[in-house]
Amino acid sequence: MSRQNKGCDDLVQGRSHNQKDVILNQTIYGLLALLPIVLCGIFLIGLQWSAKKTMPIILVVTAALAIFIWDMTLNRVSSSIIQGLVITVSVLWIVFGAIFLLNTLKHTGAIAVIRAGFTNVSPDRRVQAIIIAWCFGCFLEGASGFGTAAAIAAPLLVAIGFPALGAVLMGMMIQSTPVSFGAVGTPIVIGVNNGLDKAAISAQLAQEGVQWGEFLQLITSQVAIIHGVIGTFMPLFMVMMLTRFFGKNKSWKEGFAIWPFAIFAGLAFTIPYMITGVFLGPEFPSLVGGLVSIAIVVNAAKRGFLVPKTTWDFAPQKNWPSEWLGKLVVSKEDITLTLSDKKMSTLMAWFPYLLVALLLVFSRVFTGFQSLLNSVAVDLTSILGETDISASFSPLYLPGGLLLISALVAAAFQTRKPVSALNSAFKESTKTVLGAGFVLVFTIPMVRIFINSGVNLSDVASMPVASAELFAGTFDNVFPLISATIGALGAFIAGSNTVSNMMFSQFQYEAAMSLHISPSLIIAAQAVGAAAGNMVAIHNVVAASATVGLLGMEGATLRRTILPTIYYVLFCGIIVMAAIYIFGFQGPLA
């Protein structure tokens, strides 16, 4: 063998070894990045620890990985923690607003009227869950997003007689279909739009005569259609979960018995949702779908359309397990005393919630009003000198501020003793928020360290990207099947569809391009999966639980919400696989 040939062989072998080393390193980093997530699952679901006990440990583990494995500077880790604490204040502000409004309405007597109103629509708890959680919750998600729907719907369900754990489960399950277009389209308009390399992709699209706006609208349409198919069955899934885990007979069948009404309610939302998404864009599908479904489903329920003749209810409250009960209690005695004092119209009782919805829409749609609310803010830019780490707290623009405004209006118009009602509501709400605050103080800083780990001295991919690359490398040609799972993983970590889309949209795009399949469809799967991941996002569960005073039971909620999450990402994966490999969908750049 000549020296030249031997040298070539050595070079090839060297490259081969280098490639193996790179793959090995990527695998190790990917596995280590998953460690905090795996430990969360083991502690919360396997060992049934509370989040109060789990999350401080997970924060320490994540910080240790960031410093010793990812070579993040201590300064960057510290700035991420500060950023997380500011975000925690924002989350707790929303939670406090939701609880404060509910407690105010309890003391004005409005909750008694609302409870009676739902009984008049239908005494069937399955129907009540569909109307409040699905229809009203989807509308709230479209208007506000960021967990507000669950924070408002869960205490409202408790107020009309649902067990706290069941109310949280229903609230978490609506963190799915409407989420991709929540907060007037933020997960798409901000998340996907800013998560992609717009300049580079626009140049590639231009070669095919496609503009950036058209590409983003194509993604929006695909997200709406995928959600529309899967989401149609979510109301049925919700009531089946309700009867299985909270019915006296522990029966799936009792939930399935209402399938005609549940599917009808699903379609009442998803049809206008899909039409709006395809023809009008990402801002209004959840808003329009929610409004239309409220009008149609409430009227149908009043007329008994498709509602089973046999009414389903929970067992008497005295027979409920202690884990079902939260600290938010609306007793029958309170209701009787309140109603004996004065009568209140149904419209007046509901007015504070209608005002919340109106303020949310106005603050997200009208830029002048939006700017006015945002003028009161605390902004931290370049925290500890880290130019890409910042945080802000806008008390009036955040839903918490709008909820507080509605509570003040409610006290002014619904009772002759507004100061007394507000004082009692404040004391009760503060106790609940302080309990949730302890958990979130550890949870959200952990998330920010995880997300900000991409800037490091080792020049390795961030923890989210490393874990996603591990999935992609493992699944190769069946990657479309798990692309939604990656999106869900991002939301599980960050507690946000928007943040998951910002983290993983470019990664999903690159994976699609390398496999020569439709990048728009894979990014759509990312967005759908990220919406589904909100059902198991830890700090969303903690926040929703806090609104009903149910702390320490996060694992019990997660063990249940994992079922609809698996359904969602699996169904999405099957739809995307079928679109690509059976129906041959391509689209731009495929």
Language-model features: locations:
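Alpha-helical transmembrane segments of multi-pass membrane proteins
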Residues: 126-138, 164-177, 190, 204-235, ...
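Hydrophobic mid-bilayer segments of alpha-helices in multi-pass membrane transport proteins
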Residues: 32-42, 49-70, 92-98, 266, ...
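Juxtamembrane and boundary regions of transmembrane helices in multi-pass small-molecule transporters
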Residues: 180-266, 270-319, 528-590
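Extracellular/periplasmic helix-exit of transmembrane alpha-helices
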Residues: 104-107, 185-200, 367-374, 442-463, ...
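Membrane-interface interhelical connector segments
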Residues: 187-218, 455-476, 503-507, 515
